[in-house]
Amino acid sequence: MAFINLLILIILTLSSTPITTMSIPETNRRNATTNSYTDVALSARKGAFPPPRKLGEYSTNSTDYNLICKTCKRLSERNTCCFNYSCVDVSTNRFNCGSCGLVCNLGTRCCGGICVDIQKDNGNCGKCSNVCSPGQKCSFGFCDYA
């Protein structure tokens, strides 16, 4: 009971105490939140990449899109596609399988840039590149399913 009384006393004391804020002069405000390393990194970044965006927000600026695509192709050795402001691998992406915008049908998966039914394909049984032994048949994603 004493603990509860003490807790109530602390809450009442804190709630009646005025809150003071410390103001930073306008000239020093920028320096209070950044440092020279951040400034250098941000100034270098502005020339190389588009500004950061909120999650789920896309830019309507075609320059941003072209920059993402060029960066994507430059950094990746695989076949890539610039799709929805991101870089995708066309050898494994089911929404861009083999080429940009080619969507695999429901129940199929993109394996090596080709849409395959992994439930029936002997060369991609259950997952990409899972080859059934000679004489075995892929059924329901398993080699020689009984």
Swiss-Prot record:
Instruction: List the subcellular locations.
Output: Secreted
* Pfam family membership, one: Stig1
Leader peptide range in chain numbering: 1-23
How is it modified post-translationally?
Glycosylated.
Provide the tissue specificity: Expressed exclusively in the stigmatic secretory zone.
Q: Which InterPro entries match?
A: Stig-like
Instruction: Determine if rRNA-binding is one of this entry's keywords.
Output: no
Keywords linked to the UniProt accession: Glycoprotein, Secreted, Signal
**Keyword Signal among record annotations:** yes
* Residues carrying covalently attached carbohydrate according to the record: N31, N61, N84
GO CC entries = extracellular region
Q: Predominant location of this chain? A: secreted
Traits of the deletion mutant:
No visible phenotype. Increased exudate production by the mature stigmas, but no effects on pollen tube germination, pollen tube growth or seed set.
Purpose of the protein: Involved in the temporal regulation of the exudate secretion onto the stigma.
In the record, the note on similarity to other proteins reads: Belongs to the STIG1 family.
What protein does this entry describe? Answer: Protein STIG1
Upper lineage is:
Eukaryota, Viridiplantae, Streptophyta, Embryophyta, Tracheophyta
